[in-house]
C-alpha cells in the first residue's frame, strides 16, 4: 500500500526509513530532497498537534502524450511522430504500452514524548491504489474491468477538491509535476487563454495562471489550445482553466455542498450522462471543503446507459 514509511526528527532529518523511492536518509527540510522535489510540507507540519494528520495533494511526475485516443501508426504518421507508444502516457486499451503515472499521497503525524514533540511519522501512499477505484469501473457493466477503455466513452475518473484531475484512464490527463524542477506542469487550456498568456509576456504559463480567473465563461464554443498537444504533449486536466469543457463548471456546482448529482452533456459528438459524487474524507486541509478529498465523475454514453430499457421498450411495442 505504501511506497515509503519514515520517521524523521523535528529538524527534518530522517532517522528510520523503509522506502521504494530513495533508501538514503535525507534532510526533508530541504525541498529538493522531497519526492520529485515537489513537496513543501515541512513548514506546514510544525503546527500539527498530537493526533493531527497532514495530508498532501497527489504528487507525481507528469506523463504527457502527443496523441489523444487510440495510439495508432496512422495517427503518429499524421502527426509526424515515430510510432513509439512507450514514450507517451499510458491510456488503458488505447495505449497499454505507455508510461504510467506514478504518484504518492503523503500522510504525516507528529510523535510526542512526555508531552514534547520529538519527530514525525510519514507514510507515502501509492497512488495506484487510488486509481484502482476508478480504472476498474465501467458504468454500463456490472462487473469490474481489468483495463479501462476510454474510447467507448464509459469510464470513471477523479478530481481533487479544486478541480484538478487525479485519476483517469488516460494517464496523460492527470495533473502532475516536472520531476526536474518540482514545479506543477500547467494544465491544458483553451486557445483564448493561450493567446492572453502570450500577450501577457509572463515568463511561464504556470505563473500566468496563478492570477488568471478560474472557470471563465466556459463554453463548447471555445477551442482547445492545440499547441500544448502538438508541441509539448501537456494535457493535464485542470477544470479551473479548461474553458472549452463547460461540464467542469457543472461538476463543481453539483459538488459545491457535498453529495452528488447528474446531468446530460453533449461531448465528443455523443450525448453522455455524467454523474459526480464527492469523496467524504475530511482530514487535514480537506476538512475545509465540503467536497472533502475531491469527487468522482462517471461518464456513460446515454444510448448504452439506456440500452436495457430501450430493448424492453421495443419488445413491448412488438406485442
List where the protein language model places each region:
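PAS/PAS-like sensory domains
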Residues: 48-57, 83-87, 256-263
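Juxtamembrane extracytoplasmic/periplasmic/luminal helical "stalk" adjacent to the first N-terminal
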Residues: 1-3, 51-54, 65-67, 101-111, ...
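Conserved beta-strands of PAS-like sensory domains
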Residues: 17-19, 69-89, 97-140, 167-170, ...
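Generic short beta-strand
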Residues: 5, 106-109, 156, 263
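Extracytoplasmic/periplasmic sensory segments of membrane signal-transduction proteins
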Residues: 1-80, 131-164, 171
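Extracellular/periplasmic juxtamembrane segments that couple receptor/chemosensory ectodomains to their
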Residues: 116, 190-318
